[in-house]
Amino acid sequence: MAWTSVLLMLLAYLTGCGPQPMVHQPPLASSSLGATIRLSCTLSNDHNIGIYSIYWYQQRPGHPPRFLLRYFSHSDKHQGPDIPPRFSGSKDTTRNLGYLSISELQPEDEAVYYCAVGLRSQEKKRMEREWEGEKSYTDLGS
């Protein structure tokens, strides 16, 4: 029976079927032209936003989604191609929130904005090492 549990956990881990983070966004936000707006993305409580990068996408009517930016920290972020610096990311790790700020709002900023999260590669490697350690420990206990 122990082998079955280990095998199922391993399959779930390798296929990405383990507990996945859920994000929630408010359905609507509005502001005036020229102003600054901050959109939020809440990560489910069973995950810590501190170990995730937040990805933001914009979809204008009649256009495919386009990548705006990735934000992990002030020193670890990436702006999408041709995305002006008036689009910026941030996090509130205490409240488990990610933010997209858009300053100097323009008419073309009217769009649907999506957030997504992904493990930072260094954190993913650390978790894989921990998993290997747990797997070895489980093997020793059998």
UniProtKB/Swiss-Prot annotation:
The keyword Lyase does not apply. InterPro entries: Ig-like_dom, Ig-like_dom_sf, Ig-like_fold, Ig_sub, Ig_V-set, IgV_Light_Chain. Residues 1-19 form the signal peptide. Residues 20-41 are annotated as: Framework-1. Residues 57-70 are annotated as: Framework-2. Residues 82-115 are annotated as: Framework-3. GO terms for molecular function: signaling receptor activity. Gene3D superfamilies: Immunoglobulins. Residues 71-81 are annotated as: Complementarity-determining-2. PROSITE patterns: IG_LIKE (PS50835). Only expressed by pre-B-cells. It comes from the Eukaryota. Disulfide bonds join 41-115. It is found in: Endoplasmic reticulum. Its main location: endoplasmic reticulum. Associates with the Ig-mu chain to form a molecular complex that is expressed on the surface of pre-B-cells. This complex presumably regulates Ig gene rearrangements in the early steps of B-cell differentiation. Belongs to the immunoglobulin superfamily. PANTHER family: IMMUNOGLOBULIN LIGHT CHAIN. Interacts with IGLL1. Interacts with SYNV1/HRD1 (via N-terminus); this interaction leads to increased VPREB1A ubiquitination and degradation in pre-B cells, possibly through a lysosomal, not proteasomal, pathway. This is Immunoglobulin iota chain. It comes from Mus musculus (Mouse).
